[in-house]
Amino acid sequence: MKEYDYLIVGAGLYGAVMAHELKKKGKKCLVIDRRDHIAGNIYCEDIEGIHVHKYGAHIFHTSDKKVWDYMNQFAEFNNYINSPVAVYKDELYNLPFNMNTFSKMWNIRTPQEAKEIIEKQRKETGITDPQNLEEQALFLGGRDIYEKLIKGYTEKQWGRKCTELPAFIIKRLPFRFVYDNNYFNDRYQGIPVGGYTAIVEKMLEGTEVRTGIDFFEFRKENPEIAEKIIFTGMIDEYFGYQLGALEYRSVRFETEVLDCENYQGNAVVNYTEREVPYTRIIEHKHFEFGKQEKTVISREYSSEWSVGMEPYYPVNDEKNNALFEEYKKLAEKEENVIFGGRLGDYKYYDMDKVVAAALDRLGEFN
């Protein structure tokens, strides 16, 4: 008999939900993680009494009551509402695109005026069959919104010109003809009081966890340690990139403590000009309405991913999705290995979808 029922590779949200639920079923699990901490990309670090989102802003939002109730077992959530602001040439615009945005951009007041301007600008482009992201954005929203709020930010995010990006990245532009800066449409939203790391700690209570462990080295030394493996790392890395590497985007952060109480007055400020090198600045204290004397900001830079870097989100274009389908076929042949999570499923998951995917998968276990 093997030492563990499950070896769970990755102590992020997917792995932690799996470990918590399997422990309730009486299974013995070992959770390992390559990083020196748990909680994956939702890890929060305490700096100056502020919970710093080390791997970028994470706002929990969902319309799934089952998932909301599940998460509330582990933490109380505050009433934070995500209302980012965009800066373009020293002008501030509210996001998402709503009447506050349009009023600032065109000095108008009514939804009818906004609709007429957008429709006029759309027609002026002459585009009927968009062939790339630039044409798609112009076709959907006209030139002003594209030039000021989409173009530079998107090019920084993807590291390519909008004319070189596929049109399907922007399926629609979420225009709201009301004065409402709430970014999400979901019924439930908030930040866990005490930060995200505390949630994962609670999920992993009573389960053996080892950090700073590389799975591939560990497997060589302990090939028979568990009956089954739950792998939440990169699916292409698991198979030694034998079909070629899937593409990801990476993100780099410059975090600093500032000797002031309030730097930008908002948790998230996007910089939409191409000439500004970072995509946004996060001021972490505002997620929890902090009153600390100092503040912590993180400048976020998007970058190409290469082997050895942290993969943040998959590049889900046709080429990469087709390659993932080939890896999926290999995965189906792997006995006693379950792939899941953002990297295992090669999917850009919001946190609620990660939790839902883990709970759904657990429903298949005997």
Model-derived segments and spans:
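Short, solvent-exposed loop/turn segments at secondary-structure junctions
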Residues: L13-Y14, D36-H37, N100, E155, ...
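Short, well-ordered alpha-helix to beta-strand connector turns
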Residues: Y4, G26, T207, I225-E227, ...
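C-terminal segments that line or cap access tunnels to active or ligand-binding sites in enzymes
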Residues: E227, E237-F365
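Short hydrophobic core segments
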Residues: L7-V9, I32, E224-D236
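N-terminal Rossmann-like FAD-binding beta1-loop-alpha1 element of flavoenzymes
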Residues: Y4-V31, L362
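Active-site/ligand-binding neighborhood in enzyme catalytic cores
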Residues: K89-Y93, M99-E227, T232
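Glycine-rich FAD pyrophosphate-binding loop
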Residues: H20-E48
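Dinucleotide-binding Rossmann-like beta1-alpha1 core, especially the glycine-rich loop
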Residues: E48-K123
